[in-house]
UniProtKB/Swiss-Prot annotation:
Keyword Membrane among record annotations: yes
Keyword entries, A-Z: Cytoplasm, Membrane, Nucleus, Transmembrane, Transmembrane helix
Provenance organism: Saccharomyces cerevisiae (strain ATCC 204508 / S288c) (Baker's yeast)
Name by which UniProt lists this protein: Uncharacterized protein YBR090C
Signal peptide: none
Transmembrane regions listed in the UniProt entry: 9-25
Intracellular or extracellular location(s): Cytoplasm; Nucleus; Membrane
Source organism phylogeny: Eukaryota, Fungi, Dikarya, Ascomycota, Saccharomycotina
Superkingdom: Eukaryota
Major localization listed first in the record, in broad terms: cytoplasm
Membrane topology: Single-pass membrane protein
Entry keyword annotation includes Cytoplasm: yes
């Protein structure tokens, strides 16, 4: 049986056009975002499936170096005698969110045992 022309048994062409319009133009608008996400997903897949090569280990070693240099910068030279007599300051640095995130990343990188990361600056 075929539904009558005025019945609601089948979605109207206006409704179908609206659905097409919304989905098509949302897809067109997000085209650049989709390209970036696809590239990131592809790079992540390649990185995860790659064997532990020298390039991979060098990347992790450099990342650890930069994180540690950001976490523990060199102490500035003391300018006056009073501060020199007092001695270098202890571990009283304020934990900012960025420093906390760096410490978390650093600890996670140190705990990964699947990658042969050279333990530098430990």
């Amino acid at each position: 049986m075929v539904p009558a022309p005025g019945s609601r048994a089948f979605p109207s062409p206006v409704f179908l056009g609206g659905v097409f319009f919304v989905f098509f133009f949302r897809w067109r608008g997000n085209y650049k975002v989709q390209q970036v996400r696809l590239r990131q997903y592809w790079e992540f897949t390649l990185w995860e499936t790659a064997p532990n090569t020298k390039q991979k280990n060098d990347f992790f070693a450099k990342t650890l170096t930069y994180i540690k240099l950001a976490l523990w910068p060199q102490l500035k030279k003391q300018s006056n005698q009073r501060n020199q007599r007092r001695g270098p300051p202890g571990e009283r640095r304020i934990l900012t969110p960025l420093r906390g995130a760096c410490q978390l990343i650093c600890s996670l990188l140190m705990k990964t045992e699947t990658l042969s990361v050279p333990r530098i600056l430990t």
